[in-house]
Amino acid sequence: MIFNQLFDEKSHTYTYIISSGKGREALIIDPVIEKTNEYLNILKNLELKLVKVIDTHIHADHVTGLNELNKQTNCTRVMGETSPSEVIDIKVKDNEKIKIEDIELTTIH
């Protein structure tokens, strides 16, 4: 399993890159737009394909990299069902499962 925690000092935001490593699929949680190239380089170096990007909430502390990552990788954009954003591909409910390969995350609102 691959679990990378990255910290953006400017916005004090933690971002996570997660993959089982088996089929080389990955997801990113709470990306910061200024770090998009860094995330893409990590994915490339680890030979991972970004399939999902998740924002856990609307970010007042930074501009999300969700849409930029979608533009560059065609990954699926995920947020909670109460998000007012109209550029989300999947809106998840409380206690819903988000899966990539054999990794399963449970949403909490």
Show which residues each predicted segment covers.
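Active-site HxH/HxHxD metal-binding segment of metal-dependent hydrolases
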Residues: 12, 33-109
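Conserved beta-strand hairpin/beta-sheet module of binuclear metal-dependent hydrolase folds
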Residues: 1-49
